[in-house]
């Protein structure tokens, strides 16, 4: 398979995953937030950090996922998703949710691929924004 096509497939897969995570959480944002805060109530993470994160997370997933799907500001989207995933991995360790870390690490592998092979991002709106 051509490297540019491979890049597109990975970019779309990660973008749709992140977009979908955010999309399904937004209609039930309050319940999602309450559930996340509750899951951290016995952890070292203070609620003053957990509560705002629980409201910001779905928007970050949705926005960075959408940018990745359309290939606009791909480098920024990849870095934003990396930051989200690192925060999620840290949070998962604090509540000893070892099962979640596996899926998060798979997502990180896709992020690393996209970051490392950014030169193959040809089928994207970035081509029209950055004409160099």
Label every PLM stretch briefly.
Residues 1-32, 47-59, 63, 70-132:
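Extended, low-polarity transmembrane helix blocks
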Residues 30-41:
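Peri-membrane helix termini and adjoining interfacial loops of integral membrane proteins
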